[in-house]
Amino acid sequence: MYILFSVLALSFIIFIHELGHFLFAKLFKVKVEVFSVGIGPSILKFKINNTEYRLSPILLGGYCKLKGFDHLEKELKANKELEADKDSLFGISHFKKILIYFAGPLFNLIFSFIVFIFISMAGVIYFDYSSRVSILNKDSLLKDKFRDGDVILKVNDKKIKYFSDLRKFIPEEKSTVMFDVLREKENITFKETVSLQDFLKEIGPWADLVIADVVSNSPAKIAGMKPGDEIISIDNVILKNKRDLDYFLKNLNSDVVEIKFSRNGEIFSSKLVFHDKNKMIGIYFSPPLKRVVKVENVSSAIKNSFFKVVSALQDILYSIFLLMTNFLNASKSVSGPVGIVGILSSSYSLGILYWINSISFLSLILAGMNLFFIVIPIFDGGQIFISFIELLRGKRFKAKTIYSFYSFGIFFGLFLFGLGLFNDLKGLLNIFN
């Protein structure tokens, strides 16, 4: 059932986006020929004021077709610039056209902002780690100061309760930071010159190896492991936390290992046989600490929501930058519709507020991707970019020039979509294997 809810949620986010284009087109007297919820052949359609409204079966999409979308094609065939109708997309000013393109992402931003406000006022439920840390890199520059299992109590005399608190009190710029740490019942204080980014590269949250769930037909299931079990060692190598496990599996060459785990105080040993080269065990670990943060007043909720939106957009822009500059590594994180629905479905199991919060972030991702991917004209950012350049030039590009830009952008867009589907399929195969 939660998969269906997640599909409907994704469809609703796209509906909000297309509604922005629709309303601004109506505002500027541009004829909306078709407004469709879903894609594919229509299962329900009706016409009001020269606009055909459709409901289509594939709810992982939707569109708003404005009059003038085929204008460039007509110009290309005629091999000359044609005069556009006043109620078409090419019959209005560049500025109005930019606003119509911008309206889709704008509505997603407004939707997320409003939802964040209500969630904050209702009491935000989310998950966090304790301030107990582990060293992510065995060659870490901070390993001389920190040890696996250290509990950070204070940073510059500011109390630390959760791992996310470290982001608030460790400066962005490299500077001298005082740490108060609890290590094996002993309080230790030391100074270290570090920036937040460098710190997070070297130090991560401590995650215990207590199993929350086991995937059917997985190596762990076949080995007899159950929820509540705690992994102790693999091939007699003691594993203290998830970082140890990830590091061990990353450097493992064998397909068969001996795993030891505890259950209700009793130690069990079993053979673990891997099905694929990625060494997927087939287990989910227990979630970190549950936190409830109550925002008491509207002004605080508005302020927190604004910074949450800005921070998310910065992360999206940085992700696009990584995709462009470090494609081989970043491309592994690209998800298609199946992966997106999977993420929403997983968040649903953590509670309704957490699920709604995830929907809001997904709405921000849709807005950010549409705005920042200016090289893809099928995205709003690409259309805005073209219209803005035409506004500066004082005249339109020739149809051939725009079509060349479209051809590259559509190819790149389809490539990203195909990459997302490939990653979705690979993820599904890993689960079923």
Curated annotation (Swiss-Prot):
Residues 193-265 form the PDZ domain. Pfam families: PDZ_6, Peptidase_M50. Keywords: Cell inner membrane, Cell membrane, Hydrolase, Membrane, Metal-binding, Metalloprotease, Protease, Transmembrane, Transmembrane helix, Zinc. CDD domains: S2P-M50_PDZ_RseP-like. SMART domains: PDZ (SM00228). Its cofactor is Zn(2+). It is found in: Cell inner membrane. It is an enzyme of class 3 (hydrolase). The keyword Cytoplasm does not apply. One of its GO terms (cellular component) is plasma membrane. It comes from the Bacteria. It is a multi-pass membrane protein. The active site is at E18. Zn(2+) binds at H17, H21. Its EC number is 3.4.24.-. One of its GO terms (molecular function) is metalloendopeptidase activity. Its main location: membrane. Belongs to the peptidase M50B family. This is Putative zinc metalloprotease BB_0118.
